[in-house]
Amino acid sequence: MRLPEQPGEGKPENEKKGDGGALGGGEEPPRSQAPDFPTWEKMPFHHVTAGLLYKGNYLNRSLSAGSDSEQLANISVEELDEIREAFRVLDRDGNGFISKQELGMAMRSLGYMPSEVELAIIMQRLDMDGDGQVDFDEFMTILGPKLVSSEGRDGFLGNTIDSIFWQFDMQRITLEELKHILYHAFRDHLTMKDIENIIINEEESLNETSGNCQTEFEGVHSQKQNRQTCVRKSLICAFAMAFIISVMLIAANQILRSGME
């Protein structure tokens, strides 16, 4: 994940151009590699069901007046569904709240090693009622307007991503083409190395939990289609989560900078 630059920090003098990682095709310079984490530290696989995951009345609830409220009112059901799934991935224990520990584990699984100060700032930004955890309403109130802005929609169109992965499933585009399409869509938030790492991690996670992946396809001949659907949905979820965490890091950096002025 492209990290927001902190005041007084610069790039290492010995930074050299890399070869793009194990999958090849990368154009980003190498960064310090995060240590390997045990399986439980990796992002868990959450299958995206065929039906909508969030059918509540969130859009009908009263929100604070202002432009943020207007932007939230313009969120489509599909966009809300994707944001809800990203929240579910961050909520590792499924209790309906994101804790500071869960947020830290999610960020580490994507290769970013947050300090306690950074985690505290992000949690303070998200935790509006001060109870030490983040529920979905808080998650949406803070991040929703950012995700549905003109810039956000360009990188967070789930239907477009879904179409890209469908083409990959049907072998209409190669892995290299897939990576470069995703890099073009997310280049303001993710590096090529990030994209390669997410694909590798999601493939490994899927292999470890393949028995838990269920889709609407049944029968022996649908095994390949089930596999393709699970990979595609898992990757969509991972990229949505990475995008949201990137937005959170930008917000945290803005708070840090404003506090030093």
Swiss-Prot record:
Ca(2+) 1 binds at residues 91, 93, 95, 102. Residues 1-234 are cytoplasmic. The chain crosses the membrane at residues 235-255. It is found in: Golgi apparatus, trans-Golgi network membrane; Cytoplasm, Perinuclear region; Cell membrane. It comes from Homo sapiens. Negatively regulates Golgi-to-plasma membrane trafficking by interacting with PI4KB and inhibiting its activity. May play a role in the physiology of neurons and is potentially important in memory and learning. Interacts with PI4KB. This binding competes with FREQ/NCS1 binding in a calcium-dependent manner. Residues 8-19 have a biased composition (Basic and acidic residues). SMART domains: EFh. The C-terminal transmembrane domain (TMD) is necessary and sufficient for membrane targeting. Ca(2+) 2 binds at residues 127, 129, 131, 133, 138. Pfam families: EF-hand_7. Brain specific. It is a single-pass type IV membrane protein. Residues 1-39 are annotated as: Disordered. Its main location: Golgi. This is Calcium-binding protein 8. Keywords: Calcium, Cell membrane, Cytoplasm, Golgi apparatus, Membrane, Metal-binding, Repeat, Transmembrane, Transmembrane helix. One of its GO terms (molecular function) is calcium ion binding. It comes from the Eukaryota. The keyword Methyltransferase does not apply. The gene is CALN1. Residues 78-113, 114-149 form the EF-hand domain. The keyword Calcium applies. Residues 256-261 are extracellular.
